[in-house]
Amino acid sequence: MIQTIDFAPLDGITKIVFRQVWSQFFGGVDRYFIPFFSPTPHHLMTPRDLREVDYIHNANLPSVPQVMTKSADDFLWACDVLKDMGYTEVNLNLGCPSGTVTAKGKGSGFLAHPNELAAFFDEVFSKNPLPVSVKTRLGYETPEEFAALLDLYNRYPIACLTVHPRVRKEKYRGPVHLDIFADALANSRNPVCYNGDLRTVGEVRALETRFPTVTHVMIGRGLVADPALARKLRGGKGTDRKELTDFLAALYQGYTDFYQGQVHTAAQRMREVWFYLIHLFDDAEKLNKQLRRFRTPAEYERIQAEILASCPIRSDVQGDLI
């Protein structure tokens, strides 16, 4: 039975404005993971990174910052800074499959170098001032790599091991390897969290049926595509047209304020959200094409209004249960 639901970090989507506005309308999430930042070699935070992790902006939400690096020294520096801000946990990103990231040996690219990863963990867990959780994939090339990775993870007191059951080269395509996740669940010495392809209540319930001992999940794209998903998993109601209209208006205004009145930039941020949210609606194919191509904020506002007025919410996500 699922007891804990984490909001996964989606780079470019679940930033500070989105997290704050989303939390005002929906619910059911226990923790919000802040999209990763990479410490600079000079141990400085960029203004953009500082804005995201500034504890003043996150203290009202239970938040966990995520760090992506292959340098133990840089990671430890980041942990010291985050502890001083008030955070009580730091998450290490070993899951990002982006080619620009993995080419530098970071994210899931670090999984291709287990000896270096072991040295990293040796230093981090001997000196770290905060509990460290890890978000990982099964490996870099093949799922069979995970057995050795799990042996490595079991040597350290990882606060929580979040497993996305794909390898780097699969990115987010193809079926997840639930047989390998079963091995993680059975053999991990650390708490395990499941992440991957949870978009409906039905998919979460199917996961619970197959793995009755799973109590912790992390959901990202599913909570953007159906903002009421976590609430429904807690027994609450699905979303409706009015709630979505109010949420999107508040989000658009939030982006406009954040970008100091630059409405064009705010509309671009909304386009990114609609990449996922459009799947909540039936009969929206034509308007979705327009969403991808709009050039002005006025065009965006017209298209969104037409979707909300004319496209029905999909019947399989509208109710409390699926």
Protein language model regions, located:
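Active-site beta-loop-alpha junctions enriched in small/polar residues
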Residues: L10-G12, F37-P39, M68-K70, G95-P97, ...
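Short glycine-enriched, charge-decorated loop/helix-capping segments at active-site entrances
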Residues: G105-L111, E170, R234-G235
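Alpha/beta enzyme core
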Residues: V21-F26, L76-V90, L94-K104, N115-N190
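Short, charged, surface-exposed secondary-structure boundary motifs
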Residues: H42-L44, K171, D226-K232
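Glycine-rich, positively charged N-terminal anion/phosphate-binding segment
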Residues: L10-V81
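Alpha/beta catalytic cores of nucleotide-metabolism and tRNA/nucleoside-modifying enzymes
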Residues: M1, I5-D6, D11, I16-V17, ...
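N-terminal small/glycine-rich loop or linker at the start of catalytic domains
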Residues: M1-T4, T40-P62, C96, V101-K104, ...
